[in-house]
């Protein structure tokens, strides 16, 4: 061996994992919308400067994202005209609270796809989906925070 180079050897035990395959049930969501992955990543990053939780409100008129904390508060109102695609059950209003840290991590992968799809229903996990093309996608599910 040359000077400054060290011989390294490793021994690692084989690991057997027990696993259970999880089935993702088909859910009819009350609201579904698509936004620019880059824009939503920037919005979530900015929102995380103000609070730990994000409140998502969806109605037939608009979508709003808001948070508040010791640093202040921030609200983003997204007009329906600015959304790539949007559908909501007529008359439905959805208000859900999520951990901003988790959503931020899920939406930081904005280079995977130009748009990100969100699917929501009251008291159901939110689905965040990136279309990778060729019938491939990455989906994240995050449960809403429950009120005590």
Q: Model-derived features: where do they sit?
A:
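Structural preference for solvent-exposed beta-strand-turn elements
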Residues: 1-148
């Amino acid at each position: 061996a040359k000077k400054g180079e060290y011989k390294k050897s490793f021994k690692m035990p084989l690991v057997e994992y027990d696993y259970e395959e999880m089935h993702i049930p088909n859910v009819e969501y009350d609201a579904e919308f698509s936004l620019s992955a880059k824009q939503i990543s920037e919005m979530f990053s900015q929102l995380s400067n103000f609070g730990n939780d994000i409140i998502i409100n969806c109605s037939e008129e608009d979508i709003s994202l808001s948070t508040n904390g010791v640093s202040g508060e921030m609200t983003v109102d997204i007009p329906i005209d600015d959304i790539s695609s949007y559908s909501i059950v007529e008359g439905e209003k959805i208000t859900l609270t999520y951990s901003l840290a988790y959503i931020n991590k899920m939406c930081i992968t904005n280079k995977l796809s130009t748009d990100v799809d969100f699917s929501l229903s009251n008291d159901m996990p939110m689905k965040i989906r990136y279309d990778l093309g060729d019938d491939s996608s990455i989906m994240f599910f995050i449960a809403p925070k429950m009120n005590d």
